[in-house]
């Protein structure tokens, strides 16, 4: 193990000088034992000097301090010992429960599985959330993105999916909190504990208050733990909240390293950085990784380079809309903007496919008629259009659903709706079976039977 000296410190960027014959490689981890800091090599500047990003605060670090090259990238604990534990980017426990006691450590920089090792995902994953199961069904071993601006419910949707899938699914889950609020991480830990699923979840946190190096690498730490479970032949769930903060940390690091910014100030290698992470999140013939990623959309602009780069890698996109949230319809999923590769009659069956397309065309027609209604009123519409508007408003309300994780705030118990009940309910609405039922009966209920019961109560 070679050692060198620190020659310059500018915030999170540290330059270290090594003997020329033992220059550290890119991504090698360097240790500053005096302050217990780890650095990751990002650039070789020549003349034996390497430029590093600090994986922690550089307070107390000064010029001339000795740095040791570990000769390998950052490595983290993997395996079942990580379950029920909270770790940071370096794999150190931060839950005050003592050492992890791992039998194996893996480097966080790994190659993506080769083409011949990868497996296609066609098996449906039921979530119990009507709008998702109907409009943008998830595949087991697929990649899903939850897109939304500030405060439209990405994290709540993510928590509900974790609750529904992780509790119903008996496999292991990994949660990577990338640059999100510490409070949310704390709430999530306690929620898992109360649901008795903590012993099946590994938690990796690099929250908002951490230096950019931690936030950039914490997603790779979580992914490495998930890859180990996958390579043991398991079906793993990987939750990442939030991919945008991963991009943002990359932007900060890129600026600190002096790279020229590209569009909207993002790093010039945005697509490559996103690809490095996303290409590793994949299923192999041994096991599967089903990943659900929250993606913050800056200023509600889906064409921003960060969300736009993420779209290309996903199998299903769930777009949360502020307009729908303003109507009080939660989950605020936009049924006309959300898509899934699984939406194919050969995968989901003809009944599901036909129902989804009819629901979407009804909502699309309602969207077109809204301007006419706003100017001329409902009376100017043809009888057929009036019927479409009435059904579309019922569909819109029936797409809402009370969540288990929001019980504390709403006071109404959460609902898990099986896929067959979801299809039957929406098919009935578009077929006109419930034309005589008032639209408010469809709001915030589970299955169609609950809507009919609510209608009876409203009529009484």
Swiss-Prot record:
Regarding the membrane, this protein is recorded as:
Peripheral membrane protein
Recorded GO terms, molecular function? ATP binding; ATP hydrolysis activity; proton-transporting ATP synthase activity, rotational mechanism
EC code(s) of this entry: 7.1.2.2
Please provide the record's keywords in A-Z order. ATP synthesis, ATP-binding, Cell inner membrane, Cell membrane, CF(1), Hydrogen ion transport, Ion transport, Membrane, Nucleotide-binding, Translocase, Transport
User: Which SMART domains does the entry link to?
Assistant: AAA
Top-rank taxon of the source lineage equals: Bacteria
InterPro entries registered for this protein in UniProt: AAA+_ATPase (IPR003593), ATP-synt_VA_C (IPR055190), ATP_synth_F1_bsu (IPR005722), ATPase_a/bsu_AS (IPR020003), ATPase_alpha/beta_chains (IPR050053), ATPase_F1/V1/A1_a/bsu_N (IPR004100), ATPase_F1/V1/A1_a/bsu_N_sf (IPR036121), ATPase_F1/V1/A1_a/bsu_nucl-bd (IPR000194)
Known Pfam families for this protein?
ATP-synt_ab, ATP-synt_ab_N, ATP-synt_VA_C
Main localisation = membrane
Q: Which residues bind ATP?
A: 148-155
What Gene3D superfamilies does the record point to? 2.40.10.170, Bovine Mitochondrial F1-atpase, Atp Synthase Beta Chain, Chain D, domain 3, P-loop containing nucleotide triphosphate hydrolases
Q: One Gene Ontology cellular component annotation?
A: plasma membrane
Q: Which reaction does it catalyse?
A: ATP + H2O + 4 H(+)(in) = ADP + phosphate + 5 H(+)(out)
State its location(s). Cell inner membrane
Query: What binding partners and quaternary form does the record give?
Result: F-type ATPases have 2 components, CF(1) - the catalytic core - and CF(0) - the membrane proton channel. CF(1) has five subunits: alpha(3), beta(3), gamma(1), delta(1), epsilon(1). CF(0) has three main subunits: a(1), b(2) and c(9-12). The alpha and beta chains form an alternating ring which encloses part of the gamma chain. CF(1) is attached to CF(0) by a central stalk formed by the gamma and epsilon chains, while a peripheral stalk is formed by the delta and b chains.
Instruction: Describe the family membership recorded for this protein in Swiss-Prot or TrEMBL.
Output: Belongs to the ATPase alpha/beta chains family.
Function summary:
Produces ATP from ADP in the presence of a proton gradient across the membrane. The catalytic sites are hosted primarily by the beta subunits.
Protein name in UniProt: ATP synthase subunit beta
